[in-house]
A protein has these predicted regions:
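Conserved interaction-surface patches within small, structured recognition/assembly domains
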Residues: 1-2
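Conserved active-site-proximal loop/helix segments of enzymes involved in bacterial cell-wall
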Residues: 13-80
């Protein structure tokens, strides 16, 4: 997502999920449920907040671009029949003569 920009994996996943969700940001969670020793299930997947951070039409256009990476770009090998896959091209910072 840019040179010299440090983000965690969960931050990156959250950003891309906002694109997939039409511009809505949802707090990420990792644990869906906990099963107690007595088989009682404790759910942890409640959406704690959801807010719109970008226009849905803009997100639709970004999704189209990310989709093209898979359908006709460098990510064609990632295509999975029956699934709508989107991807981002690789970003590299090239050094020439040590710079």
């Amino acid at each position: 997502m840019g040179h010299e920009v440090a983000v965690s994996a969960i931050q990156l996943a959250t950003a891309f999920s906002a694109i997939a969700n039409g511009g809505y940001l949802v707090k990420p969670y990792i644990v869906e449920q906990i099963v107690q020793s007595d088989n009682k299930i404790e759910k942890h997947n409640n959406i704690s907040y959801k807010r719109q951070i970008a226009d849905e039409n803009i997100m639709r256009e970004i999704k189209k671009m990310l989709r093209q990476v898979i359908t006709s770009g460098t990510g064609v090998e990632a295509e999975i029949s029956g699934w709508e896959i989107a991807g981002k091209t690789g970003t590299a910072q090239k050094y020439i003569n040590g710079k």
